[in-house]
Regions:
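Phosphate-group recognition and catalysis centered on beta-loop-alpha active-site segments
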Residues: 1-105
């Protein structure tokens, strides 16, 4: 059996944020799970929902926005949305597995 932090340490920190992943990696787990979506300009962002409504409290569909429009959006406690590349950098050199679920617009 493998223990995986779903959306990072999402029970305590804003889901899918760098803080949630950093804190999850401090736990005795085997890996982390994330969801990814494409922005209008083709960037791969770490985001579960198709819109910003629930996580950021504002309207906006991920697939209809460019990364420049999304990069500054607060997803809770001052945390910002991540690119998949940023999450990969965070995990580099660590023994943890990364489970990626792709989402569609």
């Amino acid at each position: 059996m493998k223990i995986v932090a779903h959306r990072g340490y999402s029970g305590k920190y804003p889901e899918l944020s760098s803080l949630a992943f950093e804190k999850a990696l401090d736990l005795p787990i085997h890996g982390v799970e994330c969801d990814v979506r494409l922005t209008r300009d083709g960037k791969v962002v770490v985001q579960h929902d198709p819109t910003l409504d629930r996580t950021a409290g504002r309207p906006g569909r991920i697939s209809k926005l460019d990364w420049e429009e999304l990069r500054g959006v607060d997803i809770g406690r001052g945390q910002r949305m991540m690119l998949l590349d940023e999450l990969l950098e965070l995990l580099e050199g660590k023994p943890h597995h990364l489970y990626i679920e792709t989402k569609h617009p």
